[in-house]
Amino acid sequence: MDTKMTIPFSWLSKDGRLIIVARIVRAFAYGFLSVILAIYLKLIGFNDLLIGLILTSTLLNSVVFTLVASFYADRIGRRKMLIAYAVLMSISGAIFFATSNYIALITAAFIGTINVTGTETGAFLSIEQAILPQTINDAKKMNTVYALYNMVGTFAMSAGILASGLPSILEHAYGLNQIDSIRLLFVLYSSLGVGVVGIYFSLSKKIEAEEGITVANDNSKISKPLKQSLSPKSKQVIGKLSGLFAIDSFAGGFVIQSIVSFWFFTKFGVDLTIISYIFSIAGVLTAFSFIVAAKIADKVGLINTMVFTHIPSNILLIVVAFAPTLPIAVIFYLARMALSQMDVPTRQSYIVAVVKEEERTAAAGITNISRNVTQAASPSVAGYILQSLPFLSAPFVFGGVIKIAYDVILYFNFRNMKPPDEKKQ
């Protein structure tokens, strides 16, 4: 009788599992911070403009730190840079707990890798996306590892959002005032940052980008200096992808969670508690869709999966805009959310698969920056549309149409550019 036990995820190295755990801890922290940060700043007396500047600082951090990671992480060391960013994450939480001085808080927001968008788009993501292919021992698991990475992050983010209710519990159980009860979550955030530092310290040298090797005339091996840049061919590919992803992200900014929440509240008078339930169910559907996306991609390819799951989701987005009743709107919205993020793990897998190994960090970073910049602009445009047009659902229609156009352009430009593993099939 065979008594050997199968180790779960045996195809994933120890480093890969540590990266997954770091993503869970980080996403959980981002989850509750994304809910409580603006509320806390309002409670301690800052006006909407000052709050907006702090939130903008977090977006600037995402762009600047991702840019630094894109071009220096492989030279300095991926592990070192991850540790440095995690230390800054912990320090920022401590600053928010310790003081209400505006200069200190806006500085903490800029240096602290704080994420308040409800999804993770920062520098950690770019470095980890480049590392993941080196943590699997089976090339066929490439799509699966990105699906797993995104799925656990989504579940952890949802759990973090639920944890944002802890201040209310502390108020009733221990008689704390609202401000002090929220401030304790900054202690938790800082502590989780320390935990992430510990996880990154445990990573091995295997996660680093490998130096190129050349052979001299005497057959001795010589290490070439590591250059964190893209070849002319990769620049062309990543340039096109970045432009297209920027369009997709811009369209996505029309239907970020806060705008969808506003739409449900305004059009149907939905209670905030019900809205939170809708988003929670949507989060679960999204998380499971990542694994389904990996399975589909293994069968039909990454580009086909990205396009032919995305187009139906965007048609559903437009349909939601014309839903006459709340139940119909919820059904179509949830159906849309079950499909809309299936391009995320497949997109990440495709980016690192079509460039050389030493180009992965730069490729992931550049494409993430393009998404961050355009998505930061579109909510303001959506607000202008809502204010200018009599049609409350206009952002849904605009977003859906632009996204469908993106899908069509992506398909016709990249349908024949298959990653090496797909070409072998």
What role is predicted for each listed range?
Residues 164, 190-212, 406-414:
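C-terminal membrane-cytosol helix-exit motif in multi-pass small-molecule transporters
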Residues 87-103, 312-324:
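C-terminal ends and interior cores of transmembrane alpha-helices
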Residues 65-77, 168, 289-302, 386-387:
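Helix-to-loop junctions at the C-terminal end of transmembrane segments
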Residues 6-64, 237-279:
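Helix-loop boundary and gating motifs at the non-cytosolic
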Residues 53-71, 159, 280-292:
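Central cavity-lining transmembrane alpha-helices of secondary-active solute carriers
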Residues 24, 92, 102-123, 328-342:
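Hydrophobic core of transmembrane alpha-helices in multi-pass small-molecule transporters
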Residues 38-39, 43, 158-180, 267, ...:
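Transmembrane alpha-helix termini and helix-breaking/packing motifs in multi-pass membrane transporters
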